[in-house]
Amino acid sequence: MKGADRHFYIVPVGGETTVDFFEWRLVKGYLFSDFSVLYIPALAKESSIVTSAALALTRRDCKADLAQFMDGARNLTVTNGESPNSDWMFEYLSKLCLNVSRLTGSGRGETVYWEEER
């Protein structure tokens, strides 16, 4: 996951998906520069860090075949040794969710926005 930052938001269907929600719950206190944030409804639990959605983190500087998820109750590690890059992760996650969005924007301290990808 080296090179361009690739932040992924898997938006919970029917959930609260405003930019303000992301900024308040995540950027303000949860996001760090070496992590990306994902919402994975399939892994959600009532006890998750973010209500009705799982907060998952994956290191941006890890191996391309490795993704690490955390939802506050458990850790998951998913690997794909045959992939030369991290594109497989986006495809894998898109299969878990109906509504897939990618975060856009760059740099620290500035407002970031997400846009839906089809």
UniProtKB/Swiss-Prot annotation:
It comes from Snake adenovirus serotype 1 (SnAdV-1). This is Protein LH1.
